[in-house]
Curated annotation (Swiss-Prot):
This is Nucleoid disruption protein. It comes from Enterobacteria phage T6 (Bacteriophage T6). The lineage of its organism: Viruses, Duplodnaviria, Heunggongvirae, Uroviricota, Caudoviricetes. The gene is ndd. One of its GO terms (biological process) is symbiont-mediated perturbation of host cell cycle progression. Disorganizes the host nucleoid and inhibits replication, but without host DNA cleavage or degradation. Only the architecture of the nucleoid is affected. May act on the host chromosomal sequences that determine the structure of the nucleoid. Binds to dsDNA but not to ssDNA. The keyword NAD does not apply.
Amino acid sequence: MKYMTVTDLNNAGATVIGTIKGGEWFLGTPHKDILSKPGFYFLVSKLGGPFSSPCVSARFYVGNQRSKQGFSAVLSHIRQRRSQLARTIANNNVPYTVFYLPASKMKPLTTGFGKGQLALAFTRNHHSEYQTLEEMNRMLADNFKFVLQAY
């Protein structure tokens, strides 16, 4: 199993939405419409080697919410240090680039992971009403390792 890298995210079509440090936006806050989108948010520290793509430190997913808090709720959990992961991110004084990837673009990282372009074209998409973000999150854990997360 390999660590997920920025190259994997870029190949899947992820976009950078900003940078956080200690659970706060660093160098500007993205618009609320961007932060409330359902999908996956990946944190990448800039501590990659000179010839390697930086590894993804952690991943979070956000579903549809009535409150439209989205990724802002994740940052709140980090600031409140509600888990070991949140305490680490809040206290390590490391800036993390935040990448966003909607569930519709997750195929190369989940069911299509490790397949060539032709095989990927014939791999099923995630359109089932029973396919949850939690299941996609588990597929990510099956396919990749993350620096700060064990699962």
